[in-house]
Amino acid sequence: MQVENHKEEAPFAHYAELFRDLNPAAVTARLSDVRWDGKEFTLGLLGRAFAIAHPDYAIRALDGGALPPLPSQTFLLRYLLESKDVVWQGQWKTFREMPWGEMYIKPYTGRVLTRAAFTFGTRLPAFRAACEKMQALPMKHGDAGYQFDLIGGYRMQILVWEGDDEFPPNAQVLYSDNFAEGFAAEDRVVAGDILISTIKSQM
């Protein structure tokens, strides 16, 4: 594979190669939301279902729509390779409250929280319309807030506050507590990035 956008394509190529050696039975034993029919895995991401061929990676959207961007495809590969079912205890956590959160908080803040604040906090009506289009669950927190089923049993909330003359817009992203055990810190960053990008694509 000729790598042009190294930041996105090199990680994808790496995990696509690891994916070739994946044991499908081991995946479905770890992840109850994933189906395997002998040729393809089927799984959902933010309300859309995708089929991923194995061992030679190929992805298709079951709704016939656009394929997810490469970072989302890499996230799906890492999910199949590394994640597992973890029961949600009903609590919500910030990124900082989870393992390694303190170490990654600076890049996370810029890549997720600041981006969400200035992308959505200045356009609340469009943000609400996009989230409702994605059939997200409205929250009573923030000036606007919604809950999403990301993948499997993992859920996320995004809360946005509109800016004014005194304060800039603000945002917070909350994760269902099972993220702490089910995903590495870098994957939690990517999950936030994917959520923001997907909402933005609907605005």
Pin down the residues of each PLM region.
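Amphipathic, interaction-prone secondary-structure segments
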Residues: V27-P55, L137-E162
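Short amphipathic C-terminal alpha-helix that caps PH/PH-like domains
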Residues: L76, L80, G192-L195
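A recognition module on extended beta-rich or small alphabeta surfaces enriched in W/G with H and D/E
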Residues: S176-M203
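Conserved binding-pocket/active-site segment within a compact domain
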Residues: G121-E181
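Short Lys/Arg-enriched alpha/beta "domain-start" segment
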Residues: M1-K39, S72, Y79-M134
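Domain-length accessory/inserted modules outside core catalytic folds
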Residues: F50, Y104-V112, A116, H141-G142, ...
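Intrinsically disordered, low-complexity regulatory segments enriched in Ser/Thr/Pro
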Residues: R48-T74, W161-E186
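Short, charged/polar micro-motifs that form catalytic or ligand-binding hotspots
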Residues: L62, A66, A117, A144, ...
